[in-house]
Amino acid sequence: MTQAREYDYIIIGAGSAGNVLATRLTEDPDVQVLLLEAGGPDYRFDFRTQMPAALAYPLQGKRYNWAFETDPEPYMNNRRMECGRGKGLGGSSLINGMCYLRGNALDYDNWAKIPGLEDWNYLQCLPYFKRAETRDIGPNDYHGGDGPVSVATPKEGNNELYGAFIRAGIEAGYPATEDVNGYQQEGFGPMDRTTTPNGRRASTARGYLDIAKQRPNLTIETHATTDVIEFEGKRAVGVSYERKGQAQRVRARREVLLCAGAIASPQILQRSGVGNPEHLEEFDIPVVHELPGVGENLQDHLEMYIQYECKKPISLYPALKWYNQPKIGAEWLFFGKGIGASNQFEAAGFIRTNDQEEWPNLQYHFLPIAISYNGKSAVQAHGFQAHVGSMRSMSRGRIRLTSRDPKAAPSILFNYMSHDKDWQEFRDAIRITREIIEQPTMDEYRGREISPGPNVQSDAELDEFVRQHAETAYHPAGSCKMGSADDAMAVVDGAGRVHGLEGLRVIDASIMPVIATGNLNAPTIMIAEKMADKVRGRDPLPPAKVDYYVANGAPARRRA
């Protein structure tokens, strides 16, 4: 057998985290990095991934989407639910909804209360959010101006339904916020998006790898499916993978960095002999290290669409007509403008359903069209919808192997809606949304309620609607959680190092101990930026010196 190739670092997964690490680590010219990606390139000529308004298309096929399904979910009428994950350079940032949302400051302050995670508080995370970002209206105390990720803000003259929805939330007694990523997340306001100034998707492949891919010390291999991490004793020393039908082995002089995401990272650990021995023995996998938390603590956001017909003919419904699409496509392709240049999620809301919640437990995305997330089942009329879901469900799931074959889909169970609080939050979500849409500012727009429909009112009727119609927001997290070695279910420490092993870190959304309040792409990029300094042995960026909103007992809603 030929001598295995050697690199200083081997990164598994060219997604939202892996591309950040590849770019930061190769800033040191004498560090050799191999980046392995099971999917293909992010073809820049493919409008399905590059046009923001086409965001539904990559979810429909399997070129860019692993398209996993859950096991039958016991609290959801045993539905097998979608679990889409990005495949290709950029990972899930290549197929996500491009919502740039960082989470709430108290998410991170609460992580920092966990022993060993003291440096994960908000003020120590904020500099890394800023380092990653270039915001189109320039930097400030909360936002960056020269980072790899392009962030666009909503502009004057966008669809009038966005402003109407924000005003309706405020009329209903909830706060207003100028910037859900700034001083105050709580309230209704505009939503930023990860798109470039010329209207292209700002994936981490475009943002980070475009900087790094010409460097001689970075090797990128696509169509490279990782089989196992190889160990000598308790030290990770390399990776076995398959590329174009050929088995390959590479060695890591320093570390293996596992960045395959909340679904694949625990699978790879389990295949490699790291996990719960009972599960590994089912597949005759020799145990390298017993870590029962691998694949446990799995979390996600569940959401519903509350849909209405729109009385004014101003929704995006005409954009679905085939005869309008060539003009929209040309305007986007040649000028980077128009409907095609936006993901259409330009209004947000984060609210507390009661005064006891310390920070928001519901999230809204507003869309000026009535359609499902994956682009199917569009309502054939002018309409609008509010996506709403609970933020920090106590429900926990797990990921298990079904086979030693790296191409086999895992067994995924989220245990959605397994707590009483989940049901109360979703009942509240539907009722509060109806109250918001009933506000006077919506009178000129509000038509018939399409979904759930005006006859769905009682707790039992609302619960059945949730069981039948709630969908994933595509935010899996937590399956290799950070924590101290004293926590038997923690998989990594605060620097991403796998407990009990050497030369191996996990750096992606799987290490979140508790899911963030919002979409997960921006937090995952931040985690990778912060971890890059730890891997490189660099001093952390100085903590931010800013104020941030804490409700501190303030009422969740102002009553008229």
Curated annotation (Swiss-Prot):
Positions binding FAD in this chain are 8-37
* Pathway annotation from the record: Amine and polyamine biosynthesis; betaine biosynthesis via choline pathway; betaine aldehyde from choline (cytochrome c reductase route): step 1/1
EC id: 1.1.99.1, 1.2.1.8
Question: Cellular component GO terms, alphabetically?
Answer: membrane
Q: What is its cofactor?
A: FAD
Q: Which InterPro entries does the UniProt record give?
A: BetA, FAD/NAD-bd_sf, GMC_OxRdtase, GMC_OxRdtase_N, GMC_OxRtase_C
Q: What does this protein do?
A: Involved in the biosynthesis of the osmoprotectant glycine betaine. Catalyzes the oxidation of choline to betaine aldehyde and betaine aldehyde to glycine betaine at the same rate.
Protein name per UniProt: Oxygen-dependent choline dehydrogenase 1
Organism in which the protein naturally occurs: Chromohalobacter salexigens (strain ATCC BAA-138 / DSM 3043 / CIP 106854 / NCIMB 13768 / 1H11)
